[in-house]
């Protein structure tokens, strides 16, 4: 079991649904570091795409 945090109210819990507000919870731990970084190229590509979309819409 891992500690989770509610995305709506910020309360900590071990459940999938927040007992305080009924909101969704997410794992609070960062992903494990790996020097190989199998998904690094995908993450960088997605970040570039999101950045280019965001800057293009603001003009």
Swiss-Prot record:
<protein>
    <recommendedName>
        <fullName>Ribosome biogenesis protein Nop10</fullName>
    </recommendedName>
</protein>
<comment type="function">
    <text>Involved in ribosome biogenesis; more specifically in 18S rRNA pseudouridylation and in cleavage of pre-rRNA.</text>
</comment>
<dbReference type="Pfam" id="PF04135">
    <property type="entry name" value="Nop10p"/>
</dbReference>
<keyword id="KW-0698">rRNA processing</keyword>
<dbReference type="GO" id="GO:0030515">
    <property type="term" value="F:snoRNA binding"/>
</dbReference>
<dbReference type="GO" id="GO:0006364">
    <property type="term" value="P:rRNA processing"/>
</dbReference>
<dbReference type="InterPro" id="IPR007264">
    <property type="entry name" value="H/ACA_rnp_Nop10"/>
</dbReference>
<keyword id="KW-0690">Ribosome biogenesis</keyword>
<dbReference type="GO" id="GO:0001522">
    <property type="term" value="P:pseudouridine synthesis"/>
</dbReference>
<keyword id="KW-0687">Ribonucleoprotein</keyword>
<comment type="similarity">
    <text>Belongs to the NOP10 family.</text>
</comment>
<dbReference type="GO" id="GO:1990904">
    <property type="term" value="C:ribonucleoprotein complex"/>
</dbReference>
<dbReference type="InterPro" id="IPR023532">
    <property type="entry name" value="Nop10_arc-typ"/>
</dbReference>
<dbReference type="InterPro" id="IPR036756">
    <property type="entry name" value="H/ACA_rnp_Nop10_sf"/>
</dbReference>
